[in-house]
Amino acid sequence: MQTVTRLDPLRSAVAALRADGPLALVPTMGALHEGHLTLVREARQHAAHVAVSIFVNPRQFGANEDLDAYPRQLAGDQALLEAEGVSLLWAPEAAEMYPAGYATNVSVSGVSDGLCGAARPGHFDGVATVVCKLFNQVQPDLALFGEKDWQQLAVIRRMARDLDLVRPHVDAILGVPIVREADGLAMSSRNAYLSPAQRAAAASLPRAMQAAIAAMLDGQPATDCIARLTGEIISGGFSSVDYAELRDPDSLVPVTDPASQPARLFVAARIGTTRLIDNMPVSAG
């Protein structure tokens, strides 16, 4: 595996890989876990070579968020990626991605509104900007993202469609299902922030979501189920709920009656100082 930190050697490395066959990109912020490695393994099923980016993007963190505390473990991440057969690791510093005088921002409206877009103003502008840059830098034939960040995936697909991106084309931006711990908690780098007691309590989140979905499928009013879900999250050990909402899986517009239209349940909640997100389909399938 080749590790590069500067743009010029990245371009040379990408050109060599692309000459040998299709190239897949898995963008990450590092602190890799089994969820990330699942993306890498899926990427290998679609391409001759896999490139992974590790960049803790300062533009997607708010003023009071966890940029400085976000876990960084490059040496360990390199070892994991090498063991998975990754061909290229792109690990730039912030000054390489955003040099002096940088003045361009990518903003995607609509799907970025509400949910995490409301709770974290400016977050998706930072996401769209860095992913657009990564796509331009690596020129992948396809890119893979985890469905835990469902809204992020919708933003990236909208950006690719609206900007007529060729590499990757919007249809080659793939979502990979959420990877969960044995107790159901969605895998996340931020789980490392949790104390043992918080980690045990965090497993109540997916259980409460599953119970709410089961109640909706049983015909109970969605508003009642969401209200009960919020209370169960708090009683399970969380300190607050940023949102618990039903949205259309594609457009992300609010859904009031999941019995009559496709819906997905989205939740963001805080346990201690840690913010966790999750989402699940509301369907009998």
Label every model-predicted segment.
Residues 2-238, 247-251, 273, 280:
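Nucleotidyltransferase catalytic core that binds NTPs
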Residues 4, 254-255, 264-285:
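Short, basic/aromatic-enriched C-terminal tail that caps enzymatic domains
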Residues 171-172, 260-262:
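Short solvent-exposed loop/turn micro-motifs enriched in small/polar/acidic residues
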Residues 241-259, 265-266:
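A conserved acidic, glycine/proline-rich C-terminal tail/linker
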